[in-house]
Amino acid sequence: MSYYTKAKFFTSAPDIRHLKNDTGIEVAFAGRSNAGKSSALNTLTRQRNLARTSKTPGRTQLINVFELEEELRLVDLPGYGFAKVPVAMKKKWQASLGEYLQKRKSLKGLVVLMDIRHPFKDLDQDLIHWAVESNIPVLALLTKADKLKSGKRKAQLLMAQEAALAFMGDVTVQTFSSLNKHGLPELERILDGWFGLDKKSDEEGAVVEGQD
């Protein structure tokens, strides 16, 4: 069973100023309003309704926090960039996202979700630049990979990996599909590293071996 099935709703906040508990480790998920962020979180946690998927992109305006265990959290940041959202609201969200990435001490990793057919749009790039400037590792997750045939999917991945070099930071690119769970093991492996779960399992294994 995956560790991430333990996720449960912890709190919501309109912006970083209302977020408490800036201790422990947080990993944030961010993306354009139609990038499949909620679906990816639900797939990761094996929970159909942990993150609510909206048929109207741009409706999720709150920062939603899910707790895995004490001091370990997944953070669902507001979707951005949807055309029908008022400009003033867009600017408010962008400012809030930037502030969170630059000031949140417990943030140890950022997953930026992008439709594999349209990666690295302006706001995606802004988000990654902010993270790199704050020395936060980034996973650029190319979602909806099931929409492309294998050859085209690999070509898009190579193109995105090439583009990611320009950020001059710790930016990994991976393809993903919530529909067929393509890329899920790779996503979990990266999250395990950010949360320190790989070290924890190694330490537990060493203890067991020492007891033999």
Swiss-Prot record:
<dbReference type="InterPro" id="IPR006073">
    <property type="entry name" value="GTP-bd"/>
</dbReference>
<keyword id="KW-0460">Magnesium</keyword>
<protein>
    <recommendedName>
        <fullName>Probable GTP-binding protein EngB</fullName>
    </recommendedName>
</protein>
<keyword id="KW-0132">Cell division</keyword>
<comment type="similarity">
    <text>Belongs to the TRAFAC class TrmE-Era-EngA-EngB-Septin-like GTPase superfamily. EngB GTPase family.</text>
</comment>
<feature type="binding site">
    <location>
        <position position="60"/>
    </location>
    <ligand>
        <name>Mg(2+)</name>
    </ligand>
</feature>
<feature type="binding site">
    <location>
        <begin position="76"/>
        <end position="79"/>
    </location>
    <ligand>
        <name>GTP</name>
    </ligand>
</feature>
<dbReference type="GO" id="GO:0046872">
    <property type="term" value="F:metal ion binding"/>
</dbReference>
<keyword id="KW-0479">Metal-binding</keyword>
<dbReference type="InterPro" id="IPR027417">
    <property type="entry name" value="P-loop_NTPase"/>
</dbReference>
<dbReference type="InterPro" id="IPR030393">
    <property type="entry name" value="G_ENGB_dom"/>
</dbReference>
<keyword id="KW-0547">Nucleotide-binding</keyword>
<keyword id="KW-0131">Cell cycle</keyword>
<feature type="binding site">
    <location>
        <begin position="31"/>
        <end position="38"/>
    </location>
    <ligand>
        <name>GTP</name>
    </ligand>
</feature>
<dbReference type="GO" id="GO:0005525">
    <property type="term" value="F:GTP binding"/>
</dbReference>
<comment type="function">
    <text>Necessary for normal cell division and for the maintenance of normal septation.</text>
</comment>
<dbReference type="InterPro" id="IPR019987">
    <property type="entry name" value="GTP-bd_ribosome_bio_YsxC"/>
</dbReference>
<feature type="binding site">
    <location>
        <position position="38"/>
    </location>
    <ligand>
        <name>Mg(2+)</name>
    </ligand>
</feature>
<feature type="binding site">
    <location>
        <begin position="58"/>
        <end position="62"/>
    </location>
    <ligand>
        <name>GTP</name>
    </ligand>
</feature>
<feature type="binding site">
    <location>
        <begin position="176"/>
        <end position="178"/>
    </location>
    <ligand>
        <name>GTP</name>
    </ligand>
</feature>
<keyword id="KW-0717">Septation</keyword>
<dbReference type="GO" id="GO:0000917">
    <property type="term" value="P:division septum assembly"/>
</dbReference>
<dbReference type="GO" id="GO:0005829">
    <property type="term" value="C:cytosol"/>
</dbReference>
<feature type="domain" description="EngB-type G">
    <location>
        <begin position="23"/>
        <end position="197"/>
    </location>
</feature>
<keyword id="KW-0342">GTP-binding</keyword>
<feature type="binding site">
    <location>
        <begin position="143"/>
        <end position="146"/>
    </location>
    <ligand>
        <name>GTP</name>
    </ligand>
</feature>
<dbReference type="Pfam" id="PF01926">
    <property type="entry name" value="MMR_HSR1"/>
</dbReference>
